[in-house]
């Protein structure tokens, strides 16, 4: 929490002093829906500071990145089993996130949130299973309705946009087909 609040206060202070006309921040889809998560509670506090910071702003809520699949699996592993929530998941490529943030940054401030997501929805366990198979990782993947994600139990749609979202172009299978070094 302290990292996000302190860094955001500092950035807002220096942005105001520099005359910044459009403050852009990257956050996470579902931030406001998962208050049990310490990480997402900190992101929500960051967003509150930005909204009250007096600078025109846009907050980009992105879904998780394909590049995080292995790390998510590692964090959810007990023994040789990966336990992930039994929910929908709509991750996107980091390249698409960067493009979306860039488009928002050169546009007019929305003084609100823009949601961006991958072009496909998956069951969380199916996506992790596909990702691990691409890495030739033999761990078993189990959909567990009580598995925690960022410290919280999730609802079916906690990690996907609820309303209209801008969708990335890169599909998960296309991303998996890239050279292994790009998937790190």
For the regions a language model picked out, list residue spans one by one.
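A conserved pocket-lining segment of Rossmann-fold NAD(P)-dependent short-chain dehydrogenase/reductase
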Residues: 57-58, 71-92
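Mid/C-terminal beta-alpha module of Rossmann-like enzyme folds, strongest
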Residues: 95-184
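Short, hinge-like loop/turn segments at secondary-structure boundaries
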Residues: 41-43, 75-78, 158-160
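NAD(P)-cofactor binding segment of oxidoreductase domains
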Residues: 1-23, 41-52
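Conserved beta-loop-beta element that borders a ligand/cofactor-binding pocket
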Residues: 27-33, 45-68, 117
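Conserved beta-strand termini and adjacent loop/short-helix elements that scaffold enzyme active sites
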Residues: 60-63, 85, 143-146
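Short-chain dehydrogenase/reductase
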Residues: 1-5, 35-44, 87-95, 118-121
């Amino acid at each position: 929490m302290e990292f996000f609040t302190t860094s955001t206060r500092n950035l807002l202070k220096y942005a105001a002093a520099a005359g910044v006309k459009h403050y852009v921040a990257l956050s996470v889809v579902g931030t406001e829906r998962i208050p049990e998560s310490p990480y997402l509670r900190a992101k929500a506090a960051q967003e509150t500071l930005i909204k009250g910071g007096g600078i025109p702003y846009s907050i980009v809520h992105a879904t998780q990145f394909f590049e995080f699949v292995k790390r998510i699996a590692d964090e959810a592993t007990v023994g040789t089993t990966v336990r992930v929530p039994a929910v929908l998941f709509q991750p996107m490529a980091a390249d698409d996130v960067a493009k979306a943030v860039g488009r928002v940054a050169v546009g007019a401030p929305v003084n609100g949130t823009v949601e961006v997501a991958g072009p496909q929805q998956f069951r969380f366990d199916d996506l992790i299973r596909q990702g691990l198979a691409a890495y030739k990782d033999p761990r078993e993947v189990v959909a567990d309705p009580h598995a925690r994600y960022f410290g919280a139990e999730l609802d079916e749609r906690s990690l996907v946009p609820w309303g209209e979202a801008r969708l990335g172009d890169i599909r998960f299978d296309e991303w998996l087909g890239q050279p292994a070094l790009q998937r790190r």
